[in-house]
Design a protein with these regions (language model features):
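A residue-level detector for the "anchor" residue at the start of short, highly conserved motifs
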Residues: 2-226
């Protein structure tokens, strides 16, 4: 299996904190003791709190994951990630982070409460099926009804983008290919990408991105798209 983890269940709950990690280029799934399932993206890390399923259904994410949560109104499922808190209200949703501190949440069904925990008592924003929320620089921006099948394509082994910021693409390439996409032109760096990849080599991905941006693309050995 692609996932590396240490788990100890006791009486239907976690006896100790557990960490699940996926290597670059490989995704995997795990079922939590409450019946919720998680698809963990490549190069990602999920920490499950000790005592999970004993009134405390909290996890911490670095990277990206898709959560299919078994609803329990008395014990909400909470994801912590880069200063963000995503609280389930009976939901399936994805969470993705990037190196710029951006946390993006896409809801496929149900409702989540999304808030910035670095802002003290900031009120949560409610996201419903089809909604997208992005936390960056202390601000949560919401777009309603914009989530599509492309947002979850990575759970099926495909990277699909529609007007995606390059920071999101860069984070995915680190996780899936272990490469660093460098955009040395400030104007190009502000552009977005619409493209999809399945089974492409790192060199092919770089060339497609370079063409889409109207730039010269160097292969992974050179480490840049200029």
């Amino acid at each position: 299996t692609a996932m590396v983890g240490l788990a100890q269940w006791r009486g239907g709950m976690t006896a100790t904190e557990q960490v699940y990690a996926t290597p670059v280029g490989q995704r995997d799934s795990v079922m939590l003791p409450d019946g919720s399932t998680v698809v963990l993206a490549p190069g990602s890390r999920l920490t499950v709190a000790s005592g999970f399923n004993d009134g405390n259904r909290a996890v911490t994410l670095e990277g990206a994951a898709f959560f299919e949560v078994k609803h329990d109104g008395a014990h909400p499922f909470v994801v912590h990630s880069r200063g963000a808190e995503i609280r389930d209200i009976g939901t399936a949703f994805s969470v993705k982070t990037d190196a710029n501190g951006r946390v993006a949440v896409a809801v496929t069904h149900g409702i989540v409460a999304f808030r910035d925990t670095t802002a003290g008592s900031a009120a949560p924003v409610e996201l419903r099926a089809g909604d997208r929320g992005v936390l960056q620089a202390g601000t949560v921006a919401v777009t309603r009804g914009t989530v599509t099948a492309e947002d979850m394509a990575w759970t099926r082994g495909q990277l699909a983008y529609r007007d995606a910021p390059l920071a999101e693409v860069q984070a995915d390439l680190r996780r899936w290919y272990g490469i660093e996409l460098q955009v040395t032109d400030a104007v190009l760096a502000q552009r977005t990408l619409t493209a999809s990849f399945r089974g492409d080599s790192a060199a092919q991905v770089i060339q497609v991105i370079a063409l889409a941006l109207g730039a010269f693309g160097a292969g992974p050995a050179e480490g840049a798209a200029k």
